[in-house]
């Protein structure tokens, strides 16, 4: 249930989440963040104010491996799955107003372990598993999803950054180090991650993004500038 804050060069430990969990979605900023869902099909939602996490309104449907986008007062969560095996995926989309969730239009392709970025009225969903990995992209307008340009390769457990018309995806179980940029219509290849990873954290813009932690690069952090993918390599603290 630990949280850490990034200042552009180093990490410092923040106050803990009230409920520890993995495979949740997160969105917002360092001083106004949201974390929702996670393992054990949690509906739990917590908000961060830069110091403390507080519980907020529960997701309508508990799930893990979902994606999120937007701000603390105007967010959106989509996709995900819950057992049994094989996994039962969700196309569900829910919008967050800062205190409660309401259901919106479903994804066209049911998927989990997908990437997401953007805003509540202009979100982007890409990749994921159905359970086979897919390369499809969908664009959200605040009420419904429509097809966007396909990624150049199938991928799942990838992360995203940026906006619907200037997006980025990187890492993942299928492509490892690959980074792609999206212009609102199509994807193009960008400089690769130095270390391949999946099921990790990612955030930022299409010209200033962070990839942090998880499998197999547990404490490794990379910073993307749009020209050179890694300008610093930092280590997440474990204390």
Question: Whereabouts are the PLM-identified features?
Answer:
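Polar, enzyme-active/binding microenvironments
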Residues: 1-239
């Amino acid at each position: 249930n630990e949280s850490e804050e990034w200042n552009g060069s180093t990490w410092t430990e923040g106050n803990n989440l009230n409920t520890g969990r993995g495979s949740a979605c997160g969105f917002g900023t360092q001083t106004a963040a949201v974390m929702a869902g996670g393992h054990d099909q949690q509906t739990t939602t917590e908000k961060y104010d830069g110091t403390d996490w507080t519980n907020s309104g529960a997701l309508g449907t508990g799930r893990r491996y979902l994606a999120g986008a937007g701000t603390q007062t105007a967010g959106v969560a989509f996709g995900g799955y819950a057992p049994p095996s094989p996994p039962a995926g969700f196309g569900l989309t829910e919008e967050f107003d800062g205190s409660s969730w309401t259901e919106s239009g479903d994804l066209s392709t049911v998927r989990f372990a997908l990437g997401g970025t953007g805003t509540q009225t202009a979100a982007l969903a890409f990749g994921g598993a159905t359970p086979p990995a897919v390369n499809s992209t969908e664009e959200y307008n605040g009420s419904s999803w429509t097809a966007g340009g396909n990624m150049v390769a199938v991928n799942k457990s990838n992360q995203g950054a940026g906006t619907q018309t200037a997006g980025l995806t990187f890492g993942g179980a299928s492509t490892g180090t690959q980074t792609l940029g999206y212009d609102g219509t199509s994807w193009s290849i960008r400089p690769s991650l130095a270390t391949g990873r999946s099921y990790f954290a990612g955030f930022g813009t299409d010209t200033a993004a962070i990839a942090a932690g998880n499998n197999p690069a547990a404490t490794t952090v990379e910073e993307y500038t749009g020209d050179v993918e890694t300008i610093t390599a930092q280590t997440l603290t474990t204390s």
